[in-house]
């Protein structure tokens, strides 16, 4: 199980007194070249930040947006849901607010940085940490639907061969996979420090071939209902979503 590493996402700006631009604004100083350099650097940072933010949100965040459409696709089967992936506490909290829905979560990474609401879910037994490269501590068909996000992208085929069948084992009505697009590579690189390993983003054709090779079948009925519901609301997911038969 890969440990989370502390990530400092904010960059400390130097004090204004130490910035050459401040002292160089005197009319007799050489302000124009320094000001130009400062503006260029600022523009570069803004462009880099935009490129990362626009290249795709996490697939776990996408799960929140997809819940209404998953309910349309699976109906009563959404009564007992297991989510597997990072930030599972947030997903479980959202699912528990839905009518007639019970939810549990498995966090593939350490929960040492969990906030108070997440720790409360852990104490109540709704969320647990587990290494998904090994068999999950649940009996067969313990859940009606299993949703996995931002977890399989970090597994090699060696471990996928064990993890995917096990996820299907604990679900009775379907397995839903949220996987990143290869075009999200730049955004996912930022998560390297968080998850401790490089991401392996695959194309839809790769996943489809893999499902066939491992004997996992597409849930055509759920796929059709999901796409119809999404189309009516003009919902376009930022991640690949696969519906599989358990």
Predicted regions located by residue number:
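Class I SAM-dependent methyltransferase SAM/SAH-binding core
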Residues: 76-135
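A short SAM/SAH-binding and catalytic strip from SAM-dependent methyltransferases
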Residues: 144-158
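Hydrophobic adenine-recognition pocket in adenosine-nucleotide-binding enzymes
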Residues: 151, 167, 180
